[in-house]
Every structure is written in structure tokens, then in C-alpha cells.
Design a protein with these regions (language model features):
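Catalytic cores of eukaryotic secretory-pathway lumenal/extracellular enzymes that build
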Residues: 2, 6, 14, 18-20, ...
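Loop/turn segments within WD40 beta-propeller blades
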Residues: 3-10, 53-63, 113, 122-128
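Generic preference for well-ordered alpha-helical elements
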Residues: 10, 15, 19, 46-50, ...
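Short coil/turn segments within WD40 beta-propeller repeats
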Residues: 19-23, 72-75, 137-141
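Contiguous hydrophobic segments
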Residues: 10-14, 38-45, 55, 72, ...
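Structural hallmark of WD40 beta-propellers
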Residues: 9-14, 60-67, 76, 127-133, ...
Length: 149
């Protein structure tokens, strides 16, 4: 479905799949088409297709990581630990729709219907904590890595 080469280590390729799996390949390894890291049901893989993956700047612990977004409504960061791929949920995209006028006089009332399907994201070049998320519903949301959930 999607892929992204690491900007500093171009042999590392992050891949997002239609079944919700994310993987990392080392393309220097000849004749081996197995990933060096792979998400599983036990490691909280996405439950819907992954539409975008993107390497992030390495965190303070110097672990490499990348982000993924899926139709399941989750933006997740994946940390490459020594022997495993460790997920951390960044945000859940809540699907909100305005109430019917007949049900409420207050136009600001809203129902939460579940999770919005995430399609794409991009990081702000000047404020590394900020990023935009595009959803299946055609909405664009300003998000922050500083606040999760």
C-alpha cells in the first residue's frame, strides 16, 4: 500500500500493508525478502489498511522510529528496538458529526460516531510537534505529538 525510505539510512524501507501490518526491510540483504521488523496482532498492528508511513527524526533515546496512519482511525509511531517493533499510539481520530436541527437548538452539540479513517499526514517543517492529518471524510486536522490520545 505505501512505503518510505529512511532519510539517513536509505537501505531501510518502512512499508504499510492493506491488512494493517507495518514492516521494515533492509534492502542490503540480498536474496532475503523477509522484513527485519514486522507488526503483529500481539504488537497492536492496525486493523484496517495502512495508507501512509513516514520515518521521523530519531528520538532522544536514539531509537529509529516511523509513523503510520490507517483507516482504523489511529496514528501510531513504531520504535525500532533491538529485537522488536514497539508501537505507541499517537492519536485516535474521532469521527464527529453535527446533530440534526430537530434534535437540538444548540448547533454546537455533536455526536461522536466512532473513529475517522485516516488517509494521510505530514509534519510541520518549522514546529516538529505539529502535523496535519487528512481523513476519508475529507477533513484536515491539526494535531500535536505533544498530546496523545
Amino acid at each position: 500500500m505505501c512505503l518510505d525510505f529512511h532519510p539517513k539510512f536509505p537501505a531501510l524501507l518502512a512499508v504499510g500493508c492493506y491488512d494493517g501490518t507495518v514492516m521494515v526491510f533492509d534492502i542490503r540483504i540480498k536474496g532475503n525478502n523477509k522484513p527485519i521488523y514486522q507488526s503483529t496482532v500481539r504488537t497492536a498492528k492496525h486493523t484496517d489498511p495502512v495508507w501512509q508511513v513516514r520515518w521521523s527524526s530519531d528520538d532522544a533515546t536514539k531509537n529509529m522510529s516511523f509513523y503510520s496512519i490507517s483507516s482504523d482511525g489511529r496514528v501510531t509511531t513504531w520504535n525500532l528496538m533491538k529485537n522488536k517493533l514497539e508501537p505507541e499510539e499517537v492519536i485516535k481520530l474521532k469521527l464527529v458529526a453535527e446533530q440534526d436541527k430537530e434534535l437540538s437548538d444548540n448547533k454546537k452539540d455533536a455526536f461522536v460516531y466512532g473513529l475517522a479513517g485516516g488517509m494521510c499526514f505530514d509534519f510541520n517543517k518549522f514546529h516538529d510537534q505539529l502535523f496535519l492529518v487528512g481523513t476519508e471524510e475529507g477533513k484536515i486536522h491539526l494535531c500535536s505529538r505533544a498530546y496523545s490520545g
